[in-house]
Amino acid sequence: MHTIPELASPKSWQSTLPSRRAEICQAILEGLPRGFEFAKPFLSTELAEVGGTAWEVPCFYDAQHETTLTLVLGDDFTYGATAQRLDKLRDSIPAEDWSLIAPVVHAAQEAGPVHVPAFLMGRFPTFEWVIEEHVELCEGLERPDFSSEDGPFPAYVTQEEAQRFLAATGYRLPWDHEWEYVAKAGMERLYVCGDAVPQRDLSGDVCLTQFGDGQLNRAAANPWGMVALAVATFTRLQASPHEWRIRGGAAAFYPFQHRMQQAMLLTELQLPLANMPGQMAGLRLCLDVPAI
């Protein structure tokens, strides 16, 4: 586990001198496995929009596995939905939809905020070709269809396929609290991409199939630069690391939601594996920040 105070929160990072930031990023790069290099930083404009200063989110590229990782700075956040938040959700969602969603909304258990240490997370869901270069996917499984023939596509894999891939590459799954923290972008946001109900039907592109499209990426990214958190992913529970969940919303309810089911974009959805056909989900690759 790293002990770098500058990574404890976005505020700490922004108050750090540029020379020290560069020193920390260089030390992280040197602590990562061979084959990593610096990637173009993501410019977060969230603070600039509320009168602050835009800041660069450091990114690292794993050439061997063709994966870009973002340095997710630590911070405190409310893990799960508070009682007040549940009341707000209940009042904002049609009763029929709420009755279906309520059993899988993750309610807050902690008395206070949970601290998430900094870690590295893939900017995109893991693509099919990356998985297939390392493990053989089981044939005969019906995997989610996508609305466009243009790729690349995020891979939907079984738990067993995911375990084999992680063992082969040295990556890990996000802990469940890490995923929810990034989905909320360090704030109390209602939806995984933004803070308002989308004003159009997302059924055609909820999985954001054209990740190579820069405009789509910018539209889908949260303030950390994370793209397409709506794609369902496996997570692990800290209290029981052998227990997996599926997080993300939207695509977690396969087939994809229609216009009247926007509530499925809720950040706090925490689904048992049985909720996905074939117990399949996507992968968001993570690494711990190296000790410096």
Predicted regions and their residues:
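Functional-site microenvironments in short loops/helix caps that host divalent-cation chemistry
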Residues: 72, 148-149, 155-269, 279
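Extended beta-strand/loop cores of jelly-roll/beta-sandwich
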Residues: 1-177, 184-189, 261-292
